[in-house]
């Protein structure tokens, strides 16, 4: 599993792939030759993925609620049967329910932990068996700088992402003997529609925290994921790769 021709035989599942970082990851993997299945929470989102990847053979968008364990397992089973295996899982789907802790409702906490932590566990658990059977796999989860440094108003999000980082290390120890690597990529501040709409003073305050002096792009995260999915990262497991322009140095 050492070159693009081999990657063309591999299948990658990317959750939350209809926009932003997820869309960039799906595109980067497709460009590397993977057959990419991207998920979205609506039929419209799934169709957007299919169109974005239409130039690449074997790629498609699928409608999936990652909180539906039965649906997730059914999709993974269908992928392995259709393509003969599943080689890369990228856990990217996530939500936010930001507010200060004193105002945070239980449902805000529960919703974020359910999608950003529990669903990552479920998806990862569901791919373990087929990956063990083929004695090869890459599980890559998108964490966050917030999970390492914290951020006011994001106690739920920080807890979930820190939990994913810990789970990544535990799974890496469990699965390493089966040639399955498990890693995380922790984005810092990335260019989005939201950051673009911030007032100038807020943008300057944001940039002042970043030694490189600019926001990251979704493609920066996608390239990190593509590396961890590749044969070049065969000896990398249990790691959280921070891609944040230096705003947090672990």
Q: Can you describe what each PLM-predicted range is?
A:
Residues 124, 160, 168:
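Active-site helix of classical SDR
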Residues 129, 173-177, 234:
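Alpha-helical segment proximal to the catalytic Tyr-Lys
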Residues 2, 149-152, 226, 237-250:
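Short C-terminal tail/terminal secondary-structure segment
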Residues 18-20:
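Conserved glycine-rich cofactor-binding loop
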Residues 100-101, 105-113, 195, 206:
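Substrate-binding pocket helix/loop in short-chain dehydrogenase/reductase
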Residues 32-49:
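Conserved glycine-rich Rossmann-like NAD(P)H-binding loop of the short-chain dehydrogenase/reductase
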Residues 176, 181, 217, 236-238, ...:
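Short, small/polar-rich loop/turn modules that mediate ligand/substrate recognition or access, typified
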């Amino acid at each position: 599993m050492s070159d693009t021709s081999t990657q063309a035989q591999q299948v990658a599942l990317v959750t939350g792939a209809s926009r932003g970082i997820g869309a960039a990851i799906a595109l980067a993997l497709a460009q590397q030759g993977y057959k990419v299945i991207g998920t979205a929470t609506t039929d419209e989102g799934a169709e957007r993925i299919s169109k974005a990847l239409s130039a690449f053979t074997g790629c498609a968008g699928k409608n999936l609620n990652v909180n539906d364990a039965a649906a997730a397992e059914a999709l993974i089973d269908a992928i392995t049967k259709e393509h003969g295996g599943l080689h890369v899982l990228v856990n990217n789907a996530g939500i936010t329910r930001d507010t200060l802790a004193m105002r945070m409702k239980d449902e805000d906490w529960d919703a974020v932990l359910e999608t950003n932590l529990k669903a990552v566990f479920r998806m990862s658990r569901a791919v373990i068996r087929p990956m063990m059977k083929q004695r090869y796999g890459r599980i890559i989860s998108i964490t966050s700088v917030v999970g390492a440094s914290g951020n006011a108003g994001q106690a739920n999000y920080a807890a979930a992402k820190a939990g994913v980082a810990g789970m990544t290390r535990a799974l890496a120890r469990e699965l390493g003997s089966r040639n399955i690597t498990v890693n995380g990529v922790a984005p810092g501040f990335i260019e989005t529609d939201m950051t673009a709409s911030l007032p100038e003073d807020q943008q300057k305050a944001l940039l002042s925290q970043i030694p490189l002096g600019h926001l990251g792009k979704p493609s920066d995260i996608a390239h990190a994921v593509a590396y961890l999915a590749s044969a070049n990262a065969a000896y990398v497991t249990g790691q959280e790769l921070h891609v944040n322009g230096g705003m947090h140095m672990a």
